[in-house]
Every structure is written in structure tokens, then in C-alpha cells.
Amino acid sequence: MSARFIAVFCLFFTVTAHAQAPRTFSEAKKVAWKLYAPQSTEFYCGCKYNGNRVDLKACGYVPRKNANRADASNGNTSSRPGRSGISASAGKPVGAKTVRATTTCSSAPRRTCTTWCRASVRSMATVTTSVLDGCRCNVGKYGSCLTQVDFKAKKVMPRPSIRGMIARTYFYMSKQYGLRLSKQDRQLYEAWNKTYPVQPWERQRNQTVACVMGRGNEFVGPVNLKACG
């Protein structure tokens, strides 16, 4: 799994006309905190958190350095937008800018695509442990954390419990936004999708996020927008 596929790559870059959908990273971050509060589990290692503090001892996470930062959590997008190659929909406003239909995040101005990506609640991969989040471009072990990072090879192997979600997210982005997947990548994600089927929490998350964004991930399952309060 190459460095650009670190953990979950702007979970479903969904920008819709839904009235409640946030349009900036700040708005998305506020909504995401509320959405993920009941789960209270960060993305990379599955550590529990309370507010912006992570219970490192309970999940066996051992920071490589900067223990103070490791104990903090932050809402963040889980990929580098400039490397994702996601095609933006025509005429979708991105702050004060607009990304044309033929523009991809690999060719558009970094600031433009970053703003577009970060405006989506789906790009918030719960809450991430700060140190591991800061070391996504680097490699090593973090105690009992099952997500492994190989700094030299620039590869990441996410923990088993999130592999299926990662696969279904890529399938969604490939169909909805034209993300190009190599044959090898698609085979890997198909294997993950089969080995790690949709879990109840993933269906619930899909429904909850759909109520905010106005659209669900069909690879996770159907959503009922009429049930949204």
C-alpha cells in the first residue's frame, strides 16, 4: 500500500448541494466532532479518547517520540489531497474558488483541492492520534498499535478492523469521482472488502454522515434520508 494510500484518503470526497453540508474545513471539523463523539475511537490505532485527550495506556500505543503530542487528538483528513487524483465535479464552489470537471487534485492548485477535500465531513477519519498523524510520511512500530508504517519503503499496512472500510471508500471514490485504481490496488481492495465485511458501526456511520452530506456510500449499504431529523 503506497504512501498516498495512508489510512483512508479523504474519506469519500463528497461535496453536495445538501443544505446542511459544511463548506469549509472548520465547519466540517465541528460537525465531525459531534458525529464521532459516541464512538470516541481514533482511526489509526483504535485508541479511546475523551475530548482531545487519548488514553494511550489502555490501547497499548507507544509513541516513538513527543509523548505530549501523542496524548493529544485532532480532527484531520486522512490523506494528502494533492496526491489523490480525485476528479472534482463541475461547478462546485471551493471557498472562493471553483474546480472544473476536468481538474484533478493532482493537477489543480494544492490550496484549491485541499479546501475542497476538507469541506467534507466524510474526509474526517474520526480523531487521529497526533504523533502517528504527524508521522504519516515516515515508518515504525507504535507499541500495540496494529497499523504498521514502513518509513523507508513509504508503505502503510492499516489495522485489520479498518481495511474493509478503506476498500469500500476507495470503491466509492473510484465510481463517484473517477479515482484511478491500478489492477493491483483493486485486487487488494476487493480482497479486503470480502475478508472484512461491513460492520454495524459502519452502516450506522454511513447513515449518520448521509444525513449531513445528503448521500451515502452504496458500497456500505443503503441509507434512508427520510429518517434524517
From Swiss-Prot:
Pfam families: Endonuclease_1. Residues 71-81 have a biased composition (Polar residues). One of its GO terms (molecular function) is endonuclease activity. It is found in: Secreted. Residues 1-19 form the signal peptide. Residues 69-95 are annotated as: Disordered. Belongs to the EndA/NucM nuclease family. This is Extracellular endonuclease.
